[in-house]
C-alpha cells in the first residue's frame, strides 16, 4: 500500500501538471472501486479549474474553487499523467482529461482505491476528520506520542500506524522507524518512556524524510506512457529482510505477524 512518502511524491509529481488546468471531461471505465464512484462525476468536474493538489496522511486532495476530490490509492493504485489519446489498459479505471492534452489516469489492479467528491471542507469529511497530526509538522513530537500512549495496551507498532494517532505511517516505515529507535515492535505503547517517545518521534521523521528524498529521482516518471514508479530505491534496514543479517549486530532479522501484517525487527537491537 502506498504510504505517506509515496503519496507525497505522487503529489509533487502531478501537481505542476494539474494546478491551473481545466477538466475537459471525466472518463469512468470502472465505477466499482472500494466505494462506488459517483455517477455524475463527469458533470460535476467538467469545466472546473484545479486550484491545488494537497496531501493529508495517505490521501490526496485535488482542490477546486468550490469543492475537493479526495483520493486514496488503496493497495495497488497509482496515478500517472499520459497523453489524453493513450489507449487505456485493463486496470485503467478513470481519466481526468485536462485542457493541456494530458490526462490524469488511475490504474488499480485490485480496485481498492477511493475517489470521493465533496463540496464541504475535506478535512471534516468522514474519511479524514479523525486523522491525527502530520508526522513531518510541528504538531507531532515525542511529547505528543508520550501523552497519547498513556494507558494504551496495543503494541507500539500498531499504535503509530493508527491514523487517529498519526497520519500516514504504514507498515514499511513503522518497521524502519522502530528499528532506528531501538524499540521492539511488540512493546506495549503504554510502556514507552519519555525518552523512548522522543527518540521514536525523531526516527519517524527521519525515515519519512529519507524516503521522500529517495523518491525525488522518480518525479519525472509521472509523465509516462506506460509503467509506474514503484517503492523508492531506499535501502531498508529490516523491512522485507527476514533472516538477512541485521546491519547493526549481524543477527538474523526476524519476522512476525501483527494485525495481519508482517513485522520485521532485530531481537538484539530492539528492546
Swiss-Prot record:
Keywords: DNA damage, DNA repair, DNA-binding, Glycosidase, Hydrolase, Lyase, Metal-binding, Multifunctional enzyme, Zinc, Zinc-finger
Zinc finger (FPG-type): 237-271
Statement: the UniProt record of this protein carries the keyword DNA repair: yes
Active-site residues from the entry: 2-3, 58, 261
HAMAP family listed in its UniProt record: Fapy_DNA_glycosyl
Stated role: Involved in base excision repair of DNA damaged by oxidation or by mutagenic agents. Acts as a DNA glycosylase that recognizes and removes damaged bases. Has a preference for oxidized purines, such as 7,8-dihydro-8-oxoguanine (8-oxoG). Has AP (apurinic/apyrimidinic) lyase activity and introduces nicks in the DNA strand. Cleaves the DNA backbone by beta-delta elimination to generate a single-strand break at the site of the removed base with both 3'- and 5'-phosphates.
Protein name per its UniProtKB record: Formamidopyrimidine-DNA glycosylase
Lineage: Bacteria, Pseudomonadati, Thermodesulfobacteriota, Desulfuromonadia, Geobacterales
Amino acid at each position: 500500500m502506498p504510504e505517506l512518502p509515496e503519496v507525497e511524491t505522487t503529489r509533487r509529481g502531478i501537481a505542476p501538471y494539474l494546478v491551473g488546468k481545466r477538466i475537459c471531461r471525466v472518463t469512468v471505465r470502472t465505477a466499482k472501486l472500494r466505494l462506488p464512484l459517483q455517477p455524475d462525476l463527469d458533470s460535476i468536474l467538467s469545466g472546473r479549474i484545479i486550484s491545488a493538489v494537497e496531501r493529508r496522511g495517505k490521501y490526496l486532495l485535488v482542490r477546486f474553487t468550490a469543492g475537493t476530490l479526495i483520493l486514496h490509492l488503496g493497495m495497488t493504485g497509482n496515478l500517472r499523467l499520459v497523453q489524453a489519446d493513450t489507449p487505456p489498459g485493463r486496470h485503467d479505471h478513470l481519466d481526468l482529461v485536462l485542457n493541456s492534452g494530458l490526462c490524469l489516469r488511475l490504474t488499480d489492479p485490485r480496485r481498492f482505491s477511493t475517489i470521493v467528491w465533496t463540496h464541504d471542507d475535506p478535512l471534516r469529511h468522514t474519511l479524514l476528520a479523525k486523522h491525527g497530526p502530520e508526522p513531518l509538522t510541528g504538531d507531532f513530537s515525542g511529547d505528543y506520542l508520550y501523552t497519547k500512549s498513556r494507558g494504551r495496551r496495543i503494541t507500539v507498532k500498531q499504535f503509530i500506524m493508527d491514523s487517529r494517532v498519526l497520519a500516514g505511517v504504514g507498515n514499511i516505515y513503522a518497521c524502519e522507524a522502530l528499528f532506528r529507535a531501538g524499540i521492539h515492535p511488540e512493546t506495549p505503547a503504554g510502556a514507552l518512556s519519555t525518552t523512548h517517545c522522543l527518540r521514536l518521534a525523531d526516527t519517524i521523521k527521519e525515515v519519512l524524510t529519507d524516503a521522500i528524498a529517495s523518491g525525488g529521482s522518480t518525479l519525472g516518471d509521472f509523465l509516462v506512457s506506460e509503467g509506474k514508479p514503484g517503492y523508492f530505491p531506499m535501502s531498508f534496514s529490516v523491512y522485507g529482510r527476514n533472516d538477512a543479517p541485521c546491519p547493526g549486530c549481524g543477527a538474523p532479522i526476524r519476522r512476525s505477524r501483527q494485525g495481519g501484517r508482517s513485522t520485521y525487527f532485530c531481537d538484539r537491537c530492539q528492546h
